Regions:
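An N-cap/entry alpha-helix motif that binds or orients negatively charged groups
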Residues: 2-66
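Conserved, mostly hydrophobic/aromatic
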Residues: 5, 53, 78, 86, ...
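Active-site mouth loops of central-metabolism enzymes
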Residues: 52-70, 111-120, 163-165, 215-220
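Glycine/Thr-rich beta-alpha phosphate-binding loop at enzyme active sites
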Residues: 60-68, 77-96, 174-205
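Glycine-enriched alpha-helix->loop->beta-strand junction motifs that scaffold or abut catalytic
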Residues: 82-83, 108-111, 130-136, 156-160, ...
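Glycine-rich phosphate-binding active-site loops on the catalytic face of alpha/beta enzymes
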Residues: 127-147, 185-193, 234-253
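C-terminal helical cap(s) of enzyme catalytic domains, especially alpha/beta-barrels
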Residues: 204-207, 245-273
Length: 273
């Protein structure tokens, strides 16, 4: 599936390059206001574990997750619930997202926005900036070390924060040798098999230097799950499906985050990899 997604993205980027050029976007972004600090919102949150809530209609493994899907209304509910940041799925083919959701949501809420997509080309990074994103996702499983380094540097240069996602120790070592990440994500879902296991976060957190904030992603369904990854050292979590399946999104957020109202505690983690 991952290979299929990447091939689809290559085709999409090739078509996009025939329209607006990369240089046009780089020129256009000079007039844009500064981005909202995505990493800062997560690391300065009063919660012990901060929350990135995701706007997500569907996925390849689960199909339609939220039938009555209104991205702006969902973002409004997230704002009401007091989430720290919002992730917006923009992949159309596999997740039924749209790029325009970023600007639609940005006009409504003050939270910083992560563009959640499969970034394989610098064109997508510039496109993210002019489309309203404050941060982008880089997935180690689909990038080599040079791509990680180049894409990371480009994103930072144009004002975007970067969440780099890993799933195992090999990917973690690859990322750490390429860049000094401002924010690491541990995906508890194996993108090759779509199975989830929270032990992925617990185990990998032991290998990550304590100065790097970490986001635990996928498979978090209860307050106990949040407590588990928080005690292991995660500074933040990313949750989408759990909220999208609930009729009352605000209540769903509050139930999941009910134990997270205290100031952050220092968790001991390994300082070497």
């Amino acid at each position: 599936m991952l290979r299929k997604i990447v091939e689809q993205k290559k085709g999409e980027v090739a078509i996009l390059r025939q329209g607006t050029s990369l240089q046009q976007m780089l020129t256009e972004m000079k007039a844009l206001p500064a981005t909202r600090g995505f990493v800062n919102a997560l690391t300065t949150s009063p919660r012990k574990v901060s929350l990135i809530a995701e706007v997500k209609k569907a996925s390849p493994s689960k199909g339609i997750i939220r039938a009555n899907f209104d991205p702006v209304a969902i973002a409004g509910s997230y704002q009401e619930a007091g989430v720290d940041a919002i992730s917006v799925l923009t992949d159309e083919t596999f997740f039924q997202g749209e790029l325009r959701y970023l600007q639609m949501i940005k006009e409504l809420v003050p939270q910083p926005l992560l563009r959640k997509d499969f970034t394989i080309d610098e064109y997508q990074i510039a496109q993210s900036r002019v489309s309203g994103a404050d941060a982008i996702l880089l997935i180690a499983a689909i990038l080599d070390s040079e791509q990680i380094k180049h894409f990371y540097q480009m994103a930072v240069e144009i004002g975007l924060d970067v969440l780099i996602e890993v799933h195992d120790q090999t990917e973690l070592e690859q990322v750490m040798s390429a860049v000094e990440p401002m924010l690491l994500g541990i995906n508890n879902r194996d993108l090759r098999t779509f199975t989830t296991n929270l032990d992925t976060s617990v185990d990998l957190l032991k290998l990550i230097p304590s100065g790097i904030p970490v986001v635990s992603e996928s498979g978090l369904a209860t307050a106990e799950d949040v407590h588990l990854v928080g005690m292991a050292g995660a500074r933040s979590i990313l949750v989408g499906e759990q909220f999208m399946r609930q009729q009352d999104v605000v209540q769903a957020v509050r139930e999941l985050m009910q134990d997270q109202h205290m100031k952050p505690q220092v968790n001991s983690r390994g300082d070497t990899i």
